[in-house]
Design a protein with these regions (language model features):
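N-terminal leader segment of winged-helix/HTH proteins
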Residues: 1-31
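Conserved segment of winged-helix/HTH DNA-binding domains
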Residues: 6, 98-117
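A structural signal for well-ordered alpha-helices, especially hydrophobic packing surfaces
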Residues: 13, 17-20, 104, 140-144
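N-terminal helix-turn-helix DNA-binding core of bacterial DNA-binding proteins
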Residues: 21-62
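Short helix-coil-helix linker/hinge
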Residues: 30-36, 97, 122-126
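A cross-family signal for key residues in well-ordered alpha-helices
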Residues: 41-42, 105, 133
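Canonical helix-turn-helix DNA-binding module
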Residues: 47-92, 98
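Terminal interaction helix/tail motif
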Residues: 109-154
Length: 154
């Protein structure tokens, strides 16, 4: 790590991932991997997405791995639907099933509880909360720009 700020960001991100994974596991939201959860969240935010759109957000993951993950969400877990576009049969779109929407809502509820607990435990003053929110909005903007995301303010 180049400096203390980078180390702190890494350490925080690692702990957040562990904390969320443990809370989601406790809630029995479903036996989902990180990648499966992220795909559900992406499709939930953006609506129908092609498999290639989803894959473009994972540049270091092969298209076959993304496709296999989506097939598992579709065939085994019944959380997404796959549909071949009639006008271009080379394109398969993915959308959430009703079961997928329910699982996603439970994931969001669990995450809201986790982040709510963390926010309260920080003991920030109203001014600090406002500043913290600005920092988070800037970080979100950076990641959206870097990843080419357009999640409509989500």
């Amino acid at each position: 790590m180049k400096n203390n700020t980078e180390k702190l960001i890494y350490d925080m991100a690692f702990r957040v991932r562990l904390y969320i994974a443990s809370k989601i596991s406790e809630q029995k939201v479903g036996d989902l991997t990180d990648r499966e959860t992220l795909i559900l969240e992406l499709v939930g935010m953006k609506g129908n997405m092609s498999i290639s759109e989803i894959g473009s957000l994972y540049p270091t993951v092969s298209n076959s791995t993304i496709s296999t993950t989506i097939t598992r969400l579709w065939k085994d877990k019944k959380l997404v639907d796959k549909r071949i576009l009639p006008e271009n049969q080379r394109v398969t779109t993915v959308s959430l099933t009703e079961k997928g929407k329910k699982v996603l809502e439970e994931i969001k509820r669990t995450q809201a509880e986790v982040f709510g607990t963390v926010t309260v435990s920080l003991g920030l003053s109203p001014d600090q909360v406002e500043y913290f929110q600005e920092i988070l909005e800037n970080a979100i903007g950076f990641f959206d720009k870097t990843l080419g995301l357009n999640l409509d303010g989500s």
